[in-house]
Amino acid sequence: MTDKIRTLQGRVVSDKMEKSIVVAIERFVKHPIYGKFIKRTTKMHVHDENNECGIGDVVEIRECRPLSKTKSWTLVRVVEKAVL
């Protein structure tokens, strides 16, 4: 059994909540019949303790214990700030 902590990178799409952000994770999936790669997006609710993220920021997140009904990820660092 491995205890590797899952980390992902994505873009912030919402920061309207207090101490929470919504991060969109993009991945490419191959179509089973046609073989074309399709872009799929997963939205995750992430805990942002210091409210340091804004919309458009690229962030790194890691999995943690469930913090609420929908939040099981926490912010590690801001990789790139959005250009306003």
Swiss-Prot record:
<dbReference type="GO" id="GO:0022627">
    <property type="term" value="C:cytosolic small ribosomal subunit"/>
</dbReference>
<keyword id="KW-0699">rRNA-binding</keyword>
<comment type="subunit">
    <text>Part of the 30S ribosomal subunit.</text>
</comment>
<keyword id="KW-0689">Ribosomal protein</keyword>
<keyword id="KW-0694">RNA-binding</keyword>
<dbReference type="InterPro" id="IPR012340">
    <property type="entry name" value="NA-bd_OB-fold"/>
</dbReference>
<dbReference type="GO" id="GO:0006412">
    <property type="term" value="P:translation"/>
</dbReference>
<dbReference type="GO" id="GO:0019843">
    <property type="term" value="F:rRNA binding"/>
</dbReference>
<dbReference type="InterPro" id="IPR019984">
    <property type="entry name" value="Ribosomal_uS17_bact/chlr"/>
</dbReference>
<comment type="function">
    <text>One of the primary rRNA binding proteins, it binds specifically to the 5'-end of 16S ribosomal RNA.</text>
</comment>
<keyword id="KW-0687">Ribonucleoprotein</keyword>
<dbReference type="InterPro" id="IPR000266">
    <property type="entry name" value="Ribosomal_uS17"/>
</dbReference>
<comment type="similarity">
    <text>Belongs to the universal ribosomal protein uS17 family.</text>
</comment>
<dbReference type="InterPro" id="IPR019979">
    <property type="entry name" value="Ribosomal_uS17_CS"/>
</dbReference>
<dbReference type="Pfam" id="PF00366">
    <property type="entry name" value="Ribosomal_S17"/>
</dbReference>
<dbReference type="GO" id="GO:0003735">
    <property type="term" value="F:structural constituent of ribosome"/>
</dbReference>
<protein>
    <recommendedName>
        <fullName>Small ribosomal subunit protein uS17</fullName>
    </recommendedName>
</protein>
